[in-house]
């Protein structure tokens, strides 16, 4: 790309109530459940779990070796409530939804190839599958993540906060009045006392930013388009919320200097252009499946993706652990100012601890050549799965709650160990 070239780039995000993202949360909550049991009995759990939801049905499929009885149907229904679905909102009903479980233990042949259930043998723990994984970092933000990704995450957090505040107040009002929560929405004198009363849990957003390419490094200039679509109550009209949502989005863009007079806001554009609202969302509107939002989960289209999803997989699966480690490597290279932007690739074959290759590309922004940076990587980082798990403490349920990665993204969040600083030997 030519020096100082300007271009437009788009990324998208979805809320916790989006059906695909809800499935990620269910799969990762089961993983957390198993790892907590593992902590107590000191035996390795192996989890590869897919969740599918549609209508009022939750399906779980996969292989789980856990030292504790598999969660009950009531446990899953509580999780559905936590995600934000409710009968009143025409979503998955946590009081009546059926839960179908088709899960068995990890296949013996895979277990034999990968490990011998010896957690101490970190040198011999093989990769859980073949594949390629990527880590990416950029100096656009203090979090060393793309600016677009960061803005979209802030949108999600702001929407979730408004949704949870409104839901709490509606429940309190319903209890005080002795009525159903749905009746609060239907009663103007009650609902009008609650800010964002009409907001439901399913939502999608998209932002287009004008970037300047500065000799391989990326400089965000301004947001050109901000798109937000939210599920809402059937009792609200577009006119009633068309000011509130743009204010919320603009507030985030203003905070990071990304709003300009040229920024176009497209808010629930379907209702504005066609007259049809978005009152039916979640799994009633669309089926959801674990692992279908892999770009949302990573860098929003920047960098690259090897194709393997994260959620529902224990750390022996390099789809997850090696992608976290590649991010750990990338963000530490940028943090150490060895480059301004970098992509790291690693690949494996099942059963073999050592990676087949490690690749680094600094897009011409490095203070060293890419081959010299590769030497620095090999000197400071060990990509064998057992060492990854140990260094990042990936089996410690007190350190990591994997369901939290499914909430609002896996990267750029300082509470996760793969985002921590490592002092490098040059």
Swiss-Prot record:
Induction: Repressed in strain X by infection with X-bacteria. Removal of bacteria does not restore expression. Keywords: ATP-binding, Cytoplasm, Magnesium, Metal-binding, Nucleotide-binding, One-carbon metabolism, Potassium, Transferase. Binds 2 magnesium ions per subunit. The magnesium ions interact primarily with the substrate. ATP binds at residues 18, 202-204, 286, 292-293, 309, 313, 317. GO terms for molecular function: ATP binding; metal ion binding; methionine adenosyltransferase activity. K(+) binds at residue 50. Strain xD contains the sams gene. However, due to infection by bacterial endosymbionts, it does not produce its own S-adenosylmethionine synthase but is dependent on the bacteria for enzyme production. This is S-adenosylmethionine synthase. It comes from Amoeba proteus. The gene is metK.
